[in-house]
């Protein structure tokens, strides 16, 4: 899954470059043998929102769905200037399975699968309240700590994964502002930063 994210970071960068860094910190305390894996992946260029809103090559069907979603939020007065703006909504929508800004690309699931893998390693908050992941793009910040997870939705004969950060599991409902928010800081591109606690049962030695 990390490989998929690296590919995505390079493909979706308007400068066609991505950068990554990681390190592992082994910990032996209180009779417990654990480790902390730190990972940062980033690219520079257009933000996720800009890749959809200011990109003539972006699939029209996807952009139309995003605009329709914005209209629903506007009609219900769910946007708040400086707190939760259209940019943040579109960035969250872009994480959903099947959504991509690249024409004729069928994947559109690398990010959501990476998020699911993160949660699979992390486990519940009761077991691991250390692991965290953060995505920042443009003026949007999204925090993953396990409070909200990936959900499976069914439409007709199709199944797909969604991450809505609310109790309803509906992207049309405003996400929890503690985890999805508009910030004062602008990052020209996208950063994914993760801190993952690894226990001995998370890693199997191959002899």
Segments from the language model and where they lie:
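Flexible, glycine-/charge-rich segments associated with ATP-binding catalytic modules
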Residues: 50-207
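Glycine-rich acidic phosphate-binding loop
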Residues: 42-48
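Short, solvent-exposed loop/turn segments that connect beta-strands within catalytic domains
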Residues: 28-35, 125-129
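Conserved ATP-binding N-box helix of the HATPase_c
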Residues: 1-32, 111-121
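An acidic- and aromatic-residue-enriched active-site/binding cleft used to recognize and process polar
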Residues: 3, 25, 44, 138-140
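Short beta-strand element(s) in the Bergerat
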Residues: 34-39, 190
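Residue-level signal for functionally critical sites in structured catalytic/ligand-binding pockets
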Residues: 7, 43, 96-98
